[in-house]
UniProtKB/Swiss-Prot annotation:
Region (Disordered): 476-517
Designated gene of the protein: bchB
Transmembrane segments: none
This enzyme's EC code(s): 1.3.7.7
InterPro entries: ChlB/BchB/BchZ, LI-POR_suB-like_C, Nase/OxRdtase_comp1, P-CP_red_C, Protochl_reductB, Protochlorophyllide_Rdtase
Protein name: Light-independent protochlorophyllide reductase subunit B
Keywords: 4Fe-4S, ATP-binding, Bacteriochlorophyll biosynthesis, Chlorophyll biosynthesis, Iron, Iron-sulfur, Metal-binding, Nucleotide-binding, Oxidoreductase, Photosynthesis
Cofactor note: Binds 1 [4Fe-4S] cluster per heterodimer. The cluster is bound at the heterodimer interface by residues from both subunits.
Species of origin: Roseiflexus sp. (strain RS-1)
């Protein structure tokens, strides 16, 4: 476990906390040392709810271990008396699991009135996503009871959870679409559900589980055990939402015929019924994508990285509905990498051999992702909070589309990702994040007009001249780790009026991989005439061309030569 580094996923007991904090009448107790109680303040900081996190840490200290004292039964009794939960979930943290203690015996000795579930969330076998999904599946298997089907079309919604990416807004969007169809919601879990709600899950006609990371295994179990069909597609984008609605109607009609409870088949209403005002188109994306502003995006390249659900949905949305080019994609969920690749292989650019595999990245090491972004230099990155940090150093616009996130992505306002409303939200986010560069370009052309605009004083081009240097260095535990740092090229004095010939410009002794070309004033002046929003890529391509061809100095002639060779 790379505890010293940023991680895309939380630890296993963080996943347990997400499920417990989502549900009503459920409380998590972590058997952990003082340092492992960091999970509690994460929920306090990020979750926009008025309630305290539904979790307690039963502290294990060195003195307790030396004296053979066990605090867990006492903590369970205190939680039972103060909180009065229906269910207490007990799990060990990544530290205390090494003690190999019998938590089942400790829990039984507490004698609580609440039911106690000891969940084996081994942090050396699983992380946040698998832990949360495994716990939800366990709870569904434990509490679901055979039920008579409801008399009207109904669905379960599995997946929305505490600290989920825009999950609360997604749930509102799903509720609106289902209400428009006249479909009843039986149970939403884990968000807002109690263990008594889980008992009622088999009464639904179908189960909606839009997130591959959470809820789909439980939905499949319900399908296997009770014959409840599961819809596992994520309606991200206008066309996927239309397909999702048609499939939902078809599934419910088939279920109604099987159950002999549907006299009149469900039908899709006019699409205007799904809009906020009930009169207009449900989404503005189809016409907005054809405007002059969005037509310019057809020449822009995007790199997408995140979890499985949002990476696949965002790549298809950018290419199919906004017309952007996909420079590459990837996921940090390595167990989902094959599924993500199969979904996206038709969207990824192929290499010289015709295979798109080189454009796909499956890793949970954020430095590898930062290196890929630096190599591709796309106009837009859609990623996580980690990619936002990397892109800030690279001066590349970044849109957060998947966890892990920071507090600015846990909003009070209605910002769904799913459905027609989500398509509008995503289109707005792409448009406001990707840099048109017109304001800075106009300032370059006509001056700042008295505005506070700092022109670089070094004579070097703007921050596009900064480059990402990814270097291996030893960490404190002796293992090499990749580090990301940003630095500008060292300023070098260039001859003011000298003429540099092609022969004298050639780098002789150093290899091209170690020489950083120096820009002459005339080349810098020519570079500044290139629009701001493509200047960075032009500069990087010219510098790469110069290093490949052994030029130690980039003159105006070298710049022209490079642009002609590179086709631009």
């Amino acid at each position: 476990m790379r505890l010293a580094l940023w991680m895309y996923q939380g630890t296993a007991h963080h996943g347990v906390g997400r499920i417990a904090n989502s549900m009503r009448g459920v409380h998590a107790v972590f058997h952990a040392p003082q340092g492992d109680d960091y999970v509690n303040p994460i929920f306090t900081m990020l979750e926009r709810t008025p309630d305290f996190p539904r979790m307690t840490t039963s502290i294990v200290s060195g003195r307790d271990l030396a004296q053979g004292t066990v605090r867990l039964p006492e903590t369970l009794r205190a939680v039972d008396a103060q909180v009065h939960p229906d269910l207490i979930i007990v799990c060990a943290s990544c530290s205390t699991i090494l003690l190999q203690e019998d938590l089942e015996r400790m829990a039984r000795s507490a004698g609580t009135s609440a039911e106690v579930l000891v969940y084996d969330a081994n942090p050396y076998r699983m992380q946040e996503v698998r832990s949360a999904d495994g716990l939800l599946t366990t709870l569904v298997q434990r509490f679901a009871r055979p039920q008579a089907p409801l008399p009207t079309p109904s669905v379960n919604i599995l997946g929305p959870a505490s600290l989920g990416f825009h999950n609360r807004s997604d749930l509102i969007c799903l509720r609106r679409m289902l209400a428009t169809l006249g479909v009843q919601i039986n149970v939403v879990a884990p968000l807002g559900a109690s263990i008594h709600d889980l008992e009622r899950l088999p009464a639904a006609w179908a189960t909606i589980a839009p997130y591959r990371e959470l809820g789909q295994n439980a939905a499949r179990w319900l399908e296997d055990q009770f014959g409840i069909p599961a819809l596992t597609d994520a309606p991200i984008g206008v066309q996927p939402t239309l397909r999702w609605l048609r499939r939902l109607v078809e599934t419910l009609n088939e279920a109604g015929a099987r159950l002999q409870r549907l006299s009149t088949p469900l039908r899709l209403p006019p699409l205007t019924a799904f809009s906020l005002d009930g009169m207009s188109a449900p989404s503005s994306v189809p016409w907005f994508a054809r405007t002059a502003d969005m037509e310019s995006y057809s020449m822009k390249r995007a790199f997408v990285f995140g979890d499985a659900t949002h990476t696949v949905g965002m790549v298809k949305f950018l290419r199919d509905e906004l017309g952007m080019q996909i420079a590459g994609a990837g996921t940090y969920l390595e167990e989902e990498a094959e599924w993500v690749y199969q979904e996206l292989k038709e969207y990824l650019p192929p290499d010289d051999s015709g295979s798109p595999k080189s454009s796909f990245l499956a890793t949970d090491v954020f430095q590898h992702v930062a290196r890929r972004i630096a190599d591709l230099s796309p106009e837009l990155v859609c990623g996580t909070q980690m990619e936002r940090h990397a892109c800030r150093k690279l001066d590349i616009p970044c849109l957060v589309i998947a966890p892990p996130t920071h507090i600015e992505n846990h909003l009070l306002s209605y910002r769904p990702v799913l459905g027609f409303d989500g398509a509008d939200v995503l289109a707005d986010a792409v448009y406001t994040t990707a840099t048109l560069g017109m304001e800075k370009h106009l300032i370059d052309m006509f001056g700042d007009a008295g505005l506070d605009y700092d022109e670089p004083q070094t004579g070097e081009p703007r921050t596009e001249n900064q480059e990402l240097r990814v270097e291996n260095r030893a960490s404190a535990n002796g293992h090499p780790e990749a580090g990301v740092s940003v630095g500008a090229a060292e300023p070098s004095a260039a001859p003011s009026r000298s003429v540099v010939t092609e022969e004298s410009n050639r780098a002789t002794t150093p290899s091209s991989s170690t020489v950083h070309p120096v820009w002459t004033p005339d080349a810098q002046a020519m570079l500044k005439k290139i629009p701001f929003f493509v200047r960075g890529r032009v500069q990087k391509n010219v510098e790469r061309y110069a290093m490949q061809h052994g030029y130690a100095t980039i003159t105006a002639e070298v710049l022209v030569e490079a642009r002609e060779a590179l086709g631009g």
